[in-house]
A protein has these predicted regions:
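Charged low-complexity interaction tracts in eukaryotic proteins
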Residues: 7-20, 81-124, 166-170, 174-177, ...
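Short, non-transmembrane alpha-helical segments in secretory-pathway proteins
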Residues: 28-31, 132-157
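Charge-enriched amphipathic alpha-helical scaffolds
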Residues: 47, 57-100
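Amphipathic alpha-helical segments that form the core helices of the histone-fold
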Residues: 49-59, 169-174
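Intrinsically disordered, low-complexity regulatory segments enriched in Ser/Thr/Pro
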Residues: 178-208
């Protein structure tokens, strides 16, 4: 079997867990659950999140690094093996819980148990920026100027660029903020502004 993990004992990492694909996946799951809880409120219930294979590949691949599969080479079946319950590290299951993963046509469903939702609610700091952004875009008459001001409230070092792809009008992102590397893409639908956020690798894949 091809080695797919940085450590021989995947249940008890002896190295730096924070550099692993599992840690990157865990952060993404927690970020999305936080965002959902800010939008909809907290309930101790199962949460199902969907990822394309390409996004999961970005978490687990690092071209040229030891013990990694070359970029673009992890198949759907290999990813299911990586995310098999028997391969999940204790560091992940102690936080987000015993996730269940299924896949079809390179689209993955990651099912987070109620305990994972509870952990995010009770043991992670609130994301004040996301909460304010959600409240702002939900306000009638919200403008891009107000949204830009909100970004500047949290950092003087941001980037804002127009987008000409017909789907979004512009993106804003924080620079030099390692905990928030997302591209926040906005579209003015006339009556309100919507946003989606993308990790840098996914943004590059889309070719916006």
């Amino acid at each position: 079997m091809t080695k797919i993990c940085d450590f021989d004992d995947k249940m008890n990492y002896s190295g730096d867990y924070s550099t692993t694909g599992y840690a990157r996946l865990e952060k993404s799951l927690i970020d999305i659950v936080k965002e959902q809880q800010a939008k909809l409120g907290y309930r101790k219930e199962i949460v199902r999140l969907y990822y394309p294979l390409s996004t999961l590949r970005h978490f687990f691949e690092c071209a040229g690094a030891d013990n990694k599969i070359a970029a673009g080479m992890i198949s759907e079946q290999q990813m299911l093996e990586i995310l098999d319950p028997n391969n999940l590290p204790k560091q992940l299951t102690d936080t987000i819980g015993e996730i269940n993963v299924t896949a079809k046509n390179e689209r993955f469903c990651i099912e987070i148990p109620p305990e994972g939702s509870e952990y995010v609610h009770e043991n992670t700091a609130d994301n004040e920026f996301i909460s304010e952004l959600i409240a702002l875009v939900g306000t009638h008459g919200c403008t891009m100027e107000q949204i830009t001001e909100l970004f500047y409230k949290y950092s003087d070092n941001i980037e804002k660029k127009d987008m000409q792809n017909g789907e979004f009008d512009c993106y804003i992102r924080f620079l030099n903020e390692p905990d928030d590397t997302y591209y926040y893409c906005f579209h003015d639908e006339g009556c309100h502004i919507i946003y989606h956020r993308f990790l840098p690798q996914d943004y590059a894949d889309f070719g916006f």
